[in-house]
A protein has these predicted regions:
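Receiver (REC) domain active-site loop signature in two-component systems and cognate sites
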Residues: 58
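Two-component/phosphorelay signaling modules centered on CheY-like receiver
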Residues: 11-32
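Short hydrophobic/Thr-rich beta-strand motif most characteristic of the beta2 strand and flanking loop
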Residues: 25-35, 43, 91
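Alpha4 helix (beta4-alpha4-beta5 surface) of REC/receiver domains from two-component response regulators
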Residues: 65, 86-103
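Interdomain helical linkers/hinges and coiled-coil/dimerization scaffolds
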Residues: 95-96, 102, 108-177
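Helix N-cap/capping motif at the beta->alpha junctions
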Residues: 18, 33-42, 63-65
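Active-site residues of response regulator receiver
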Residues: 8, 55
Length: 177
């Protein structure tokens, strides 16, 4: 299950988007809301969030500062910025971060925002699946390696192979003598 954090100092924007995302995703995505950058940072310090959709200009902490503060907490989070201003200097600064995943203008409309967040949620879900699969492969490899080590030792004890063959096999089995 993915988590989306909406951050904007305009409550009507946050509430409107939250309503649309909750209707769109049902219970498949947790939607968190914040009306300030500082409050959003507090949420991020206490919750695993996959995607942040944040305004740029907010009174207590701007979106760029929020992104920078979040980088140490969650290095794989996806940040998408939403603004009423076409600020190329800001876009340039924000895009330097590995967390940056896009910049949308509020005037582009809800459908553009919804589609972009759909893409980010799908990408986060794919990344989570890949991480689980990698973990499962590592567990299987560890189990298999133990089996191979036992089999090799049994073969060595029974006289199966020359000393040179044994020495050559040990590094591949993560073993030393």
């Amino acid at each position: 299950m993915q988590t989306l954090l909406l951050v904007d100092d305009e409550p009507n924007i946050v509430e409107g988007l939250a309503s649309q995302f909750e209707g769109r995703y049902g219970g498949d995505v947790i939607v968190l809301k914040s009306f300030s950058g500082l409050h959003a940072l507090s949420i991020l310090q206490n919750n695993k969030v996959d995607v942040v959709l944040s305004d740029i200009r907010m009174p207590d902490m701007d979106g760029l500062t929020l992104q920078r503060e979040t980088e140490a907490l969650w290095p794989h989070i996806h940040f998408v910025f939403l603004s009423g201003f076409d600020d190329f200097q800001f876009i340039h600064q924000a895009s330097k971060s590995p967390l940056y995943h896009g910049y949308l203008l509020k005037m582009e409309g809800d459908e553009v925002v919804l589609n972009k967040i759909d893409q980010e949620i799908a990408q986060c879900a794919a990344e989570a699946r890949a991480e689980l699969e990698q973990g499962e492969m590592q567990r299987r490899y560890a189990r298999m390696q133990g089996f191979l080590q036992r089999a090799a030792l049994e073969g060595f004890v029974r006289g199966g192979g020359s000393w040179q063959q044994i020495q050559h096999s040990l590094p591949n089995l993560a073993m030393t003598l």
